[in-house]
Swiss-Prot record:
GO cellular component annotations of the record: protein-DNA complex
Domain of life the protein comes from: Bacteria
Record's protein name: Uncharacterized HTH-type transcriptional regulator sll1512
Pfam families registered for this protein in UniProt: HxlR
Annotated transmembrane regions: none
InterPro entries noted in UniProt: HTH_HxlR (IPR002577), WH-like_DNA-bd_sf (IPR036388), WH_DNA-bd_sf (IPR036390)
GO molecular function: DNA binding; DNA-binding transcription factor activity
Biological processes annotated in GO: regulation of DNA-templated transcription
Domain HTH hxlR-type, residue spans: 25-123
Transcription in keyword set: yes
Organism from which the protein derives: Synechocystis sp. (strain ATCC 27184 / PCC 6803 / Kazusa)
Keywords assigned: DNA-binding, Transcription, Transcription regulation
Gene3D superfamilies (alphabetical): Winged helix-like DNA-binding domain superfamily/Winged helix DNA-binding domain
Length: 135
């Protein structure tokens, strides 16, 4: 019986060398980190600058508070975003991209271009394309 590798439809016969040698496929690693509903869109919003939970919820219609909180925690755990808590009453929490998170910008730009091409329509104005956004 052929071995089927987790997270893929690959069998031993057609497997990528990464799987055969026990190495982690870099593409699979990124997919594992970002393959959750809303994660990419949260990052898109954080490229516009530091955001509070309410601002993110407003920008992501359909995303529940519970789901957003879970995604933010996952991204923070992986070092992609910062969570800054300010000692105020009521407490203020703001999220921003880490240096590691900012490395994702070229990928998001490529996704934006591909999506625009596939939609065959004029794309939205996006600060990702102009290089604007957080430093």
């Amino acid at each position: 019986m052929e071995k089927v590798f987790p997270h893929t439809a690959m069998t031993q016969a057609n497997a990528d060398p990464c799987f055969e040698t026990g190495h982690i496929c870099p593409i699979q690693h990124v997919v594992d980190l970002l393959d959750n509903k809303w994660s990419i869109l949260v990052l898109r919003e954080l490229f516009k600058g530091q955001r509070r939970t309410g601002q993110l919820l407003d920008a992501l219609p359909g995303c529940s508070t519970k789901t957003l909180t879970l995604r933010l925690r996952q991204l923070e755990t992986h070092g992609i975003i910062n969570r800054d808590v300010y000692p105020e009453i009521p407490p203020r929490v703001e999220y921003s991209l880490t240096a590691r998170g900012r490395e994702i910008q070229p990928v998001l730009i490529a996704m934006h271009k591909l999506g625009s091409d596939w939609l065959e329509q004029e794309s939205c104005e996006c600060s990702l394309l102009t290089g604007e956004g957080p430093n």
